[in-house]
Regions:
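A short helix-loop-beta-strand connector motif used in the catalytic cores of GNAT acetyltransferases and
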Residues: 27-37, 41
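Conserved beta-strand-loop-alpha-helix junction that forms the acyl-donor binding cleft
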Residues: 56, 101-110, 142-160, 215-216
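Conserved acyl-donor/pantetheine-binding loop and adjacent beta-alpha core of acyl/acetyltransferases
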Residues: 57-104, 108, 184-185
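Long, charge-rich C-terminal accessory regions
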Residues: 171-280
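Short beta-strand-centered segments at strand-helix junctions
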Residues: 281-316
């Protein structure tokens, strides 16, 4: 029998997680980062296998400057000539500085079905939002900025980014993935100094580069769908290196975060038919679990062992 669990990541996970993605980290690790791992356990063999991971980073761009392109629009019109031209533009900036980010997303696509991948993403997203809800309650303050997630963009069969080849490579010739492996996470901040600061007209780019703006890599579409179901949307910003879209939402607009509550937990011997799946986070420690539970008044009745007396909880949905 397979059961799902959530835990924090550690040094022992690095090698496996690194094998899931060529991109690597988007930022330097900080003490307040939260690294979450979803794993499935074979209860008969008593073996746990990591399945997917993400990091929750606060204060994006405050320690290391981050840049994105804003995808905008300018209009050139001459009514007397009956001309009206709308042009898409790219303007580099730091609009998401201070945001909270869902970062370093990776999944074991080789061993999980699409349905299992989707479930793992839902589980991780709910766990991350529960942690944010608990922290906001403790601090009696709301973190500034939106919640964002930068998705990988399109690459051709040779592994090259058409967008980078059409724009960035004119200013820095090396492939972005190779550059990140050579120089680490700071290379994006450094390379931004070489890229144009003035608006770039998308019509000046090759067709393949234009077509890649805001498009998601096929292998990341499951993650995109999970973000959309959670309440995030495309925010008219893309990554510098591959034009992958940045999804965003104000924290107060996320249904899962608004539904998170601090609830008393009690144990029942068996879950009734109406019980649903809930994600629980212990009030005092970073201990999550997935449990079948029933909402009774303001409290939760949890089937099996109720290890927590008080927990932050949200329906899995």
């Amino acid at each position: 029998m397979k059961t799902w669990h959530i835990r924090t990541g550690g040094a022992g996970d690095l090698a496996l997680v690194s094998s899931w993605t060529p991109q690597g980290s988007l930022g330097e690790d900080a003490p307040d980062d939260l690294w979450l791992v979803a794993e499935w356990r074979d209860t008969l063999a008593n073996v746990a296998t990591p399945a997917a991971t993400l990091k929750l980073r606060r204060g994006v761009g405050m320690r290391q400057v981050r840049h994105w392109y804003h995808v905008g629009c300018v209009v050139h019109a001459a009514p007397e000539l009956q001309l009206f031209h709308r042009q898409s533009t790219l303007l580099m900036g730091n609009d998401y500085t201070g945001a909270t980010e869902l970062s370093d997303v990776a999944c074991d696509t080789g061993h999980l079905t699409l349905a299992e991948q989707a479930f793992a993403w839902r589980l991780l997203l709910q766990a991350a939002l529960l942690h944010l809800a608990r922290d906001r309650d403790r601090a009696r303050a709301r973190p500034a900025g939106p919640l964002i997630a930068e998705l990988p963009g399109l690459r051709d069969p040779a592994g090259q980014s058409p967008f980078w080849q059409g724009l960035g490579a004119h200013f820095y010739a090396e492939d972005p993935l190779q550059a990140q492996r050579r120089f680490g996470v700071r290379w994006r901040s450094d390379v931004a100094a070489l890229l144009p600061r003035h608006p770039v007209y998308a019509s000046f780019l090759p067709p393949a580069a234009r077509a890649a703006i805001g498009q998601v890599a096929p292998e990341a579409r499951g993650w995109r769908d999970a973000l959309v179901q959670t309440g995030l949307h495309y925010g008219q910003h893309v990554a510098l290196h591959d034009a992958g879209p940045v999804f965003e939402s104000h924290l107060d607009a996320l249904p899962a975060l608004l539904a998170a509550r601090r609830r008393p937990v009690s144990r029942v011997a068996a879950a009734p038919e109406r019980a649903g799946w809930w994600v629980l986070l212990d009030e005092r420690s970073d201990a999550w679990r997935l449990a079948r539970a029933t909402l009774v008044g303001e409290g939760l009745q949890v089937a099996g062992d109720a290890g927590e007396r008080i927990a932050w909880a949200v329906p899995l949905g």
